[in-house]
Design a protein with these regions (language model features):
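Bacterial N-terminal signal peptides that target proteins for export
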Residues: 1-8
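N-terminal intrinsically disordered, low-complexity segments enriched in P/E/S/T
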Residues: 22-162
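Bacterial N-terminal signal peptides
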Residues: 8-16
Length: 162
């Protein structure tokens, strides 16, 4: 019984000392950060869903032809108020990749939160998934460099000036 009390006490102590950020962050929050000003804008799932909707129907290396629905990156950036030359996209699993702004302009990539009408879950590419129109631009985009930019489980994007 004494061992149980010590384990309980230690558990409570470690829980109390855990980082506060873990308690503030909610799966589905998306933070856009500006590297230059260090300002940030966080979209909740609810505020993200109020932005203009965009769709891309395409295959990916991991999915058959699928209708992805979300918000164009142009609209996400406009709503955040940040501009730059590169987007550093970060995922929940700490994967990150840099996406040149010319991709946003040339291919109208989207930040999807639905797949075939169903909200993306973390175990299924969610909460957000960067999607390029691969089928519409097959000759240009069906290359490993672009596959590496199809980031799922996106939780933050840093707008960079370089």
């Amino acid at each position: 019984m004494k061992g149980f009390n010590i384990v309980t006490l230690l558990s409570i102590t470690f829980f109390a000392l855990s980082p506060a950020r873990a308690m503030d962050y909610r799966i589905g929050d998306l933070t856009i950060q500006d590297e230059k000003s260090h300002a940030s804008h966080t979209f909740s799932k609810e505020s993200f869903s109020t932005l203009p909707r965009a769709m891309i129907t395409t295959t990916t290396p991991w999915t058959p032809s699928t209708k992805f629905e979300g918000v164009s990156m142009k609209d996400v950036l406009a709503a955040s108020g940040f501009t730059g030359k590169t987007l550093r996209v970060h995922a929940l699993n700490d994967y990150w990749v840099d996406i040149p702004m010319k991709d946003v302009d040339s291919y109208n990539i989207i930040l999807a939160n639905k797949r075939d009408g169903v909200e993306l879950k973390v175990r299924d590419f969610g909460p957000y998934f960067i999607v390029y129109p691969l089928d519409d631009n097959a000759e240009d985009l069906n290359k490993p460099i672009y596959y590496s930019r199809l980031v799922w489980q996106v939780d933050s994007i840093t707008v960079m000036q370089k």
